[in-house]
Amino acid sequence: MAVERTFVAIKPDGVQRGLVGEILGRFERKGFKLVGLKQLAPSRELAGEHYGVHRERPFFAGLVDFITSGPVVAMVWEGDGVIASARKLIGATKPLEAEPGTIRGDLAVNIGRNVIHGSDGPDTAQFEINLWFSPEELNAWTPSDQSWRVES
């Protein structure tokens, strides 16, 4: 499996509820490598670009209002198959349909407050990483336990 990067964001509800450490821990325990991390208050412009594919949908304004309502923790994770694996860790978009053991299954109840966003594919991941991070904000590094994470 190829080493990939994906974009993950803890939304304002997850930050306000103090779930940042819990969520970071789940990705770290899985064995993924954190290569970008920052907390920010997204501008309406950034939010509009991020959710641009939904611009013509009736819920677009609500998405922008919510993601700009408080701080967001933006992350870039790296690892073998990280895009698909992150989606499994995160769980279904609708928390009541998310499996127990997933982030949304364990920590969210309502689709409008579903705690976390994760890229849904390679093209989206690249777009979102480039949108939220500059190249200088991403750190290539090798964990000391790398040989224990994946078979070479």
Swiss-Prot record:
Under which EC number(s) is this enzyme classified? 2.7.4.6
Chain positions recorded as ATP binding sites: K11, F59, R87, T93, R104, N114
CDD domains, from UniProt? NDPk_I (cd04413)
The protein's matches in InterPro entries, at most eight in alphabetical order, are given as: NDK-like_dom, NDK-like_dom_sf, Nucleoside_diP_kinase, Nucleoside_diP_kinase_AS
Q: Keyword set for this entry?
A: ATP-binding, Cytoplasm, Kinase, Magnesium, Metal-binding, Nucleotide metabolism, Nucleotide-binding, Phosphoprotein, Transferase
Q: Which Pfam families does the entry mention?
A: NDK
Q: Which GO terms describe its molecular function?
A: ATP binding; metal ion binding; nucleoside diphosphate kinase activity
Subunit composition and interactions = Homotetramer.
The family classification in the record reads: Belongs to the NDK family.
Q: What class of enzyme is it?
A: transferase
In its UniProt record, which GO terms are filed under biological process? CTP biosynthetic process; GTP biosynthetic process; UTP biosynthetic process
This protein's GO CC annotations: cytoplasm
- Name under which the protein is recorded: Nucleoside diphosphate kinase
Q: Which residues form the active site?
A: H117 (pros-phosphohistidine intermediate)
> What species is this protein from?
Prochlorococcus marinus (strain MIT 9303)
Which compartments does it reside in?
A: Cytoplasm
